[in-house]
Design a protein with these regions (language model features):
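Membrane-proximal intracellular helices of multi-pass ion channels
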Residues: 1-459
């Protein structure tokens, strides 16, 4: 009776209380995933005409909506044209965000964007305020469709002589959207099921086109806006400068590390010529930025290659983009904080600007949560599935950072491990901080008192 009364009291308090933007975003992604799951379980979605079981459909719908790319089976051989179309819609919704698509309909209907919608837009685009959010949303829509269209046109023209116009058009559209949204899904299974882009590892047009789409999609919408204004580097915001510097540094370092550890590995880069090694080393660095396309066998990577891949996957792309992971600026803030503390400084600075303590704490919170979740997931997968710890960690980080690369272990995961990967993909796309603040924390209020401080032994 007491439990029932407490529930009724909580329910009455919630009546009439509007949902926060964080809860709206998290709930909307969950609804989209469930709708996608229902569509994928229909017999018409399967290439064989048989109904797909619920768990694999849920796994695939979550992977598509959360723009990850992990899947228990080959996309082309499992899904019909209808099923692939459902996946494409889920990828677009998940990559651009449901608010972008909703805003498109608002613009088409010539309706006004209300305050609540602006708040949700700002949260979805990782903005600190609502100023200029509608204009930025227009830029996101126009820029995204334009870039995807250019990528689709290039790929269609390139594939046309080899596959015919209709198939080339579908390949161009699907892979352009998948690459730009950093999803990693491919429909090249008619060439070799489950091979991803390995059949194109000697094709610079395909790899460089998809790589460019991945990089642009992972920069973030705020960065696009500043780049479109053609400002000099010094006049750009600190955020944009950090994103550009971090992206360039991560791409170059990932390229160098991949070539270093895989150069003589005959199962990956070792059997290629100089040009092939450099091309595939660069594409591996790009795809680790949460893209999920594989031009080399990820399961054949050396232990050093897998360890480096885990680190780069964990960092991910930039905030307000189609990519996942810790985010580039979060990683940079952590490095700047470490550098400041090692020098005995109490403030964190970048480009002669001080970073607020709250944002430093947010970065530390996200990083700590991601690392702990990654290691817990690896241990859980090892305990429930016949997978080595390195491959389990690779799989857990790939899901949590919405990368989509796999060392060949996705198909051998147990049911509990698959459920964990589904949760990790969802957490990775919505954001650990968004979920914690939206659902786990109570109403934000001023602290009425603090306990007395105490000193501990640290280090």
């Amino acid at each position: 009776m007491r439990l029932r009364n407490r529930f009724l009291l909580w329910y009455r308090k919630r009546q009439g209380r509007p949902m926060s933007p964080m809860k709206i975003i998290a709930s909307a992604f969950a609804i989209i995933i469930l709708l996608g799951t229902v569509l994928l379980t229909l017999p018409v979605a399967s290439r064989t005409g048989e109904r797909c079981p619920f768990l694999p459909a849920l796994f695939t719908a979550t992977s598509a909506t959360c723009v990850t790319g992990l899947t228990p089976f080959d996309t082309y051989t499992q899904w019909s044209g209808f099923g692939q179309g459902v996946l494409l819609c889920l990828i677009e919704l998940g990559g651009l965000g449901f608010m972008s698509v909703a805003t498109l309909f608002v613009f088409l209907l010539r309706r006004r964007v209300g305050l609540k919608q602006r708040m949700v837009m700002a949260q979805a685009l990782s903005l600190n305020d609502m100023e200029g959010v509608v204009r930025l949303q227009r830029t996101v829509l126009v820029g995204s469709f334009s870039i995807e269209g250019i990528g689709a046109a290039i790929l269609t023209v390139y594939f046309w002589p080899r596959f015919g116009f209709s198939r080339a058009l579908w390949l161009g559209v699907f892979h352009s959207v998948s690459a730009f949204c950093n999803a990693g899904f491919d429909v090249f299974g008619f060439l070799e099921p489950g091979a991803s882009l390995i059949t194109f590892q000697d094709d610079p047009v395909v790899l460089l086109t998809l790589g460019a789409l991945v990089i642009v999609g992972g920069l973030g919408f705020l960065v696009w806006e500043e780049l479109a204004e053609r400002k000099p580097f010094r006049r750009m915001t600190v955020y944009t400068r950090l994103v550009l510097c971090a992206t360039a540094a991560l791409l170059l370092s990932g390229w160098a590390v991949t070539c270093l550890v895989e150069w003589n590995n005959p199962a990956t880069l070792g059997s290629m010529g100089l040009g092939g090694k450099l091309l595939n080393g660069f594409f591996q660095s790009v795809t680790l930025r949460t893209a999920g396309f594989a031009a080399i066998d990820q399961g054949a990577l050396t232990d050093g290659g897998k360890a480096a891949s885990v680190l780069f996957m964990l960092v991910g792309g930039s905030s307000g983009s189609t990519a996942g992971g810790l985010k580039t600026v979060t990683f940079v803030v952590l490095l700047l904080f470490l550098w400041a503390r090692l020098r005995g400084k109490s403030t964190v600075c970048a480009f002669r600007r001080t970073i607020p303590d709250k944002q430093v704490l947010d970065a530390m919170t996200i990083a700590t949560a991601m690392v702990l979740l990654a290691f817990f997931g690896a241990v859980f997968i090892c305990a429930t599935s016949p997978v080595s710890f390195v491959n389990a960690l690779f799989e857990a980080v790939s899901a949590l950072a919405t990368v989509g690369l796999t060392a060949g272990t996705t198909g051998s995961l147990s049911v509990p491990a698959q459920c964990l990967i589904i949760l990790y993909m969802y957490f990775g796309r919505v954001g650990v901080l968004t979920i914690s603040l939206g659902f786990l924390s109570g109403e934000q209020a001023m602290e009425r008192f603090r306990y007395a401080q105490t000193n501990l032994l640290i280090g």
